[in-house]
């Protein structure tokens, strides 16, 4: 029965859309007979989003210009130090981020490698204290004001 949700048996006609991303897929649902879904008012708008990597800065700007030519509001590029991002919303209201890695070094080593070495320690501190770890505070000092 095409009107039944396979995992729950719930009666709710839907369209299941898959977007291939490299070796993975993102799955989206359209539920035409359901009330319009809202957002979680307790979650800031910037928190829940999907980030996808693009090839280079030129491609990032090309996509930004294309989206703007279609009438989309695009924020950025935003300098995060180790990558630059643009942000926009899809027609269903999902926030999307496109990122391109940047070459950044810290004390003569790739910033990404330094962050990977610190990851476990930072996660442990976060889990124990609930406070943002200070291990990568140096990264924020490299950002444009």
Which stretches of residues belong to each language-model region?
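A short, acidic/glycine-rich surface segment
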Residues: 2-7, 33-39
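Generic beta-structure capping elements
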Residues: 22, 29-31, 101
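A short, polar/proline- and glycine-enriched secondary-structure boundary/capping micro-motif
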Residues: 37-41, 107-110
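Vicinal oxygen chelate
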Residues: 33, 43-45, 49-95, 100-106, ...
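Short, conserved, surface-exposed binding loops centered on an aromatic residue
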Residues: 18-20, 39-43
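Core segments of cupin and vicinal oxygen chelate
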Residues: 1-26
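Short, well-ordered beta-strand micro-motif
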Residues: 18-20, 30, 89
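A short, polar/charged loop-to-alpha-helix boundary motif
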Residues: 104-120
């Amino acid at each position: 029965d095409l009107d039944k949700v396979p995992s729950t048996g719930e009666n709710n006609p839907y369209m299941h859309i898959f977007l291939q991303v490299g070796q993975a897929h993102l799955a989206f649902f359209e539920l035409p007979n359901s009330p319009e879904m809202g957002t979680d008012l307790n979650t800031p708008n910037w928190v829940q989003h999907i980030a996808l990597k693009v090839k280079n800065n030129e491609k990032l700007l090309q996509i930004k210009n294309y989206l703007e030519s279609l009438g989309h509001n695009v924020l950025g590029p935003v300098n995060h130090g180790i990558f630059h991002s643009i942000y926009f919303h899809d027609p269903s209201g999902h926030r999307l981020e496109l990122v391109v890695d940047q070459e950044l070094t810290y004390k003569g080593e790739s910033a990404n490698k330094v962050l990977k070495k610190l990851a476990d320690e930072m996660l442990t501190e976060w889990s124990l204290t609930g406070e943002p770890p200070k291990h990568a505070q140096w990264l924020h000092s490299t950002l444009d004001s």
